[in-house]
């Protein structure tokens, strides 16, 4: 049975939720599931915007047929070829061999690589600035390279001001029938998942996102239809402002993310003392995590959110504790920058981790200010925090 939502007089959401998938891209936990959004326009010609993941293909196809009500499907626009949005292309074309597929040249190359065969006579290749008229609706095509794949584009309905934004403005989380942003408490229930989605999936490509936002600023956008998460039909400035923060790597809030690596609880105890001292000084926006038991996607999200980081780690085989090193490597890979960082190191002998973390941050990441006064403990903290000044490239032993 179809499960659809009418967005406007002639535009329908025909996507589906997936609550069974545990890991998005087989790496990021999604305890609230995820939606795969697809949209169907009923004009003089019928137009389907993107498809859906194979896991929800049956529901997706039922939705499409339920809205078409026997009409043929004239066009399929593919904005993004990643399989969670393109895996059902062949199933659509098997049921609707009359359909012409509209996308860009690189997208058709990727479709062929993935095995989504579209015959040449059934292709319309578009580029930046091209338009296609389907009746009263005219769609313009805008390139969005590296947001977050090279072939990505967005489609803009010049008639209604609807932006089909591909993976931009998306979020983790199943919709559960509530399609629009004003049908949910976005700040409370969706913002963290939207941030975690952006920072871990798109975060590396901030400059490309800013290019797309620059193009979008020239459009009179009335509604945003992303491929994941809620549809934005009001307060669009809110999500655009969030994207500007994330894409420019500016923190959303003044606060401290305190991440610790502790084998026997001693480094954790030191981190707890620091958190208490910060609270006494009036900094109560503190968020403390064990790097060994917290999925990195949550740490990355909060690293983008807050202005200050504290990294507290034991020395491990004369190096950085592996889970902490993974976190550092992820921050580097996702291009995090413009943060103030404090360091706590622990070692019972040959305590090298503080200097190694400092060296990593200063040599591999942009605009990271590492405080020169670090904290060294030997095995466990006694008598208060010990400060080591002017370290470079390693901490002094005390």
In which residue ranges do the predicted regions lie?
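FMN-binding flavodoxin-like domain, especially the glycine-rich phosphate-binding loop
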Residues: 175, 186-224, 229-231, 273-289, ...
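Conserved beta-strand hairpin/beta-sheet module of binuclear metal-dependent hydrolase folds
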Residues: 4-65, 154-157, 162-165, 267
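Active-site-proximal loop/helix segment associated with metal-binding centers of metalloenzymes
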Residues: 148-152, 160, 168-203, 247-252
